[in-house]
C-alpha cells in the first residue's frame, strides 16, 4: 500500500564549537618620517571571506583591518596607521565532511603592538572563531494513503474484498498533529551604505584623517513579501588634521540613517527569521565641496547579512490504520524533527564608571565613547539562556596635557544577562547573537566618567522531538477464527483509556457506526459510558 508523504526540509546543527587562535605579523610604519612614541588607541574589524569544509576540518580565510592612533617622536600632531592583513587558519573538527555547511563568525579577544624599533612593530591579535556546522536533512512523513494504490495480491477472496488496497476509501486512518519547522532559506547577502557628511562651518576643512571609527547602531530588520527591509544608523567618528598649518587636531561625530531592502523570494511577513548583520568593510574619504574646500566626508560601508528563514507548519501525520475485516499492520520507525521553541529578544542597560588616569592630565572634554561585548560562555539555566562575558568600554577625550592632548582610556567589566527561553533543555539547539545598540558618556567630575551602554541580545531555540512515524503499511493474513468468533452485537461499559478508535478496531466495526448506533455527537467518551457495538463484517 502506497503512502502519500510530505517532506520537511531541515537544517540540523552537526557541530557547534569555539576556537581561539593568534595572527601575528611584523609591520613597518607607512610614513617613513615617523617613529612611534606613544600609542593612543587601536581597533580592528575582522571579516570572514570564505570557509572551505573538508573531512574533519575547515579552512577559514579572513581579513583583519586595523587602525593605530599614535603620537610620533618627531611631532606633537597625532598620526594614524591603517593596514590590512589576510590570514588563513585550518581548524580540526571531527565528524564533519565536505557536504556540510560551516558558518564562522570572528571576535577579537585581544590585540597588542610591540615595537621592534622606531619604524617596525609586531602586531599580534587573538581571535575567537564561533563555528556552527550544519547539514540539510530531509524528513519524509506519511500523511495519507495513496488512493491510486491497486493491483496487489491477496491470500483469499475475503482479504481482497476487505483489505482496503483496491478499496482504500474505506480505510480508517488515525492521525496526530505535529508542529514542525522547515528551513526556507540559508544564505548570505550584502547591503551597501553610501552617504556624505558635511563638516560644520565652525570646524576647519579636512587635511588628513588619522582615525575613523564606524559602527552600527539601532538596527531593525524585518521580512516582507519577497524582500528583507533594513533600517539602522551608522555612528561615524573621525579625528583629522586640518588643512591649515599650526591648527590643533579636530574631531567630528555624526550619525547616518540608512534604510533599504534586499530582494529574497523566500521571504514573507509570517516567516520566522534569524538575521545577523555586521560591518564587513568601511571606507571614509574626504572630498571637495562646491566651494573647493575639503568639507565633505564620503562614508561607504558594506554590511554583510547572514539570513536564515524558517516556516512553521502544522502537519497531520498517520498514526495508525484500520479496516474492518482486514489486517493492516503499520511499520513504524523512530525519527527526529525540530520545532520552534522560542524566538526572543532582550535588552539591558549597563552602567560603567571609569576613573581617569591623572598621569595623562585632567579630563577636559569627551570626544567619543564606545563599548564592545565579548561573550565567554552561554549557559542553559532556569528556562533561559544566560550569556556571561565582558563589556569593554572606552572613551577618547581631550586632556590638559598640551603636548599630547588626545587620550584614550578603557575599562573591562563583567557582563551577565539572561534571555527567556521557556522550556529549553540542554540538548536543544539554539542561535544567540548580541550587539551594542547605544553608548553615551558623561563627566561626573574631572576625575570620573559614567558610560551607559544598551546591549541587545536575540535568541532562537529549536526543540528536538523524537517520535515514531509510519513508514509503510503491510497486509497480513486475517485471523478468520477471531473474526468469526467476535460477537455481532455487544454491550460494553467504557473503561479508563478507551477511545472509539480502540473499540472499533477491537470489535471489527467503524467509529461512524458506533456513533450512529449510540447517538453520539462527537468521539468523546468517558469511563462508565454504556455503548452498543455492532460488528461491521463477517467472513
Regions found by a protein language model. Give the residues of each.
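Extracellular LysM carbohydrate-binding repeats and other cell-envelope/extracellular binding modules
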Residues: 509-539
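Membrane-lipid interaction segments
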Residues: 2-486
Amino acid at each position: 500500500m502506497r503512502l502519500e508523504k510530505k517532506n520537511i526540509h531541515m537544517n540540523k546543527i552537526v557541530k557547534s564549537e569555539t576556537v581561539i587562535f593568534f595572527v601575528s605579523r611584523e609591520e613597518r610604519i607607512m610614513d617613513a618620517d615617523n617613529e612611534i612614541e606613544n600609542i593612543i588607541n587601536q581597533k580592528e574589524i575582522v571579516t570572514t571571506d570564505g570557509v572551505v569544509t573538508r573531512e574533519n576540518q575547515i579552512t577559514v580565510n579572513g581579513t583583519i583591518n586595523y587602525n593605530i592612533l599614535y603620537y610620533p617622536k618627531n611631532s606633537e600632531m597625532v598620526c594614524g596607521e591603517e593596514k590590512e592583513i589576510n590570514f588563513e587558519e585550518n581548524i580540526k573538527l571531527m565528524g564533519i565532511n565536505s557536504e556540510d555547511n560551516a558558518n564562522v563568525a570572528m571576535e577579537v579577544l585581544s590585540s597588542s603592538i610591540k615595537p621592534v624599533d622606531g619604524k617596525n612593530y609586531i602586531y599580534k591579535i587573538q581571535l575567537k572563531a564561533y563555528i556552527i556546522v550544519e547539514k540539510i536533512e530531509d524528513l519524509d512523513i506519511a500523511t495519507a494513503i495513496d488512493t491510486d494504490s491497486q493491483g496487489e495480491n491477496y491470500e483469499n477472496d475475503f482479504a481482497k474484498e476487505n483489505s482496503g488496497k483496491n478499496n482504500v476509501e474505506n480505510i480508517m486512518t488515525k492521525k496526530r498533529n505535529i508542529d514542525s519547522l522547515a528551513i526556507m532559506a540559508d544564505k548570505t547577502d550584502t547591503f551597501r551604505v553610501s552617504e556624505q557628511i558635511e563638516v560644520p562651518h565652525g570646524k576647519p576643512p579636512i587635511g588628513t584623517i588619522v582615525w575613523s571609527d564606524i559602527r552600527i547602531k539601532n538596527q531593525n530588520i524585518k521580512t516582507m513579501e519577497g524582500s528583507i527591509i533594513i533600517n539602522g544608523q551608522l555612528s561615524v567618528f573621525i579625528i583629522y588634521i586640518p588643512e591649515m598649518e599650526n591648527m590643533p587636531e579636530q574631531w567630528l561625530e555624526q550619525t547616518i540613517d540608512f534604510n533599504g531592502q534586499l530582494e529574497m523570494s523566500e521571504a514573507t511577513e509570517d516567516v520566522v527569521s534569524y538575521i545577523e548583520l555586521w560591518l564587513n568593510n568601511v571606507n571614509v574619504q574626504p572630498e571637495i565641496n562646491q566651494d573647493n574646500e575639503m568639507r565633505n566626508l564620503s562614508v561607504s560601508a558594506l554590511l554583510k547579512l547572514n539570513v536564515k528563514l524558517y516556516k512553521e507548519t502544522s502537519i497531520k501525520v498517520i498514526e495508525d490504520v484500520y479496516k474492518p475485516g482486514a489486517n493492516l499492520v503499520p511499520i513504524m520507525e523512530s525519527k527526529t524533527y525540530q520545532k520552534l521553541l522560542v524566538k526572543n529578544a532582550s535588552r539591558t542597560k549597563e552602567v560603567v564608571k571609569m576613573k581617569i588616569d591623572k598621569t595623562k592630565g585632567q579630563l577636559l572634554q569627551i570626544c567619543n565613547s564606545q563599548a564592545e561585548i565579548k561573550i565567554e560562555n552561554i549557559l542553559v539555566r532556569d528556562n533561559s539562556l544566560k550569556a556571561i562575558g565582558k563589556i569593554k568600554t572606552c572613551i577618547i577625550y581631550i586632556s590638559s596635557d598640551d603636548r599630547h592632548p588626545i587620550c584614550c582610556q578603557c575599562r573591562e567589566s563583567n557582563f551577565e544577562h539572561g534571555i527567556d527561553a521557556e522550556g529549553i533543555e540542554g540538548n536543544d539547539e539554539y542561535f544567540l547573537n548580541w550587539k551594542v545598540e547605544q553608548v553615551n558618556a558623561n563627566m561626573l567630575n574631572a576625575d570620573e566618567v559614567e558610560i551607559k551602554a544598551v546591549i541587545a541580545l536575540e535568541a532562537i531555540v529549536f526543540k528536538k522531538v523524537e517520535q515514531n512515524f509510519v513508514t509503510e503499511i503491510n497486509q497480513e493474513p486475517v485471523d478468520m477464527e477471531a473474526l468469526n468468533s467476535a460477537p455481532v452485537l455487544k454491550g460494553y461499559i467504557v473503561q479508563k483509556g478507551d477511545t472509539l478508535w480502540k473499540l472499533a478496531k477491537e470489535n471489527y466495526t467503524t467509529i461512524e457506526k458506533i456513533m450512529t448506533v449510540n447517538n453520539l455527537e462527537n468521539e468523546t467518551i468517558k469511563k462508565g459510558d454504556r455503548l452498543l457495538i455492532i460488528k461491521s463484517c463477517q467472513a
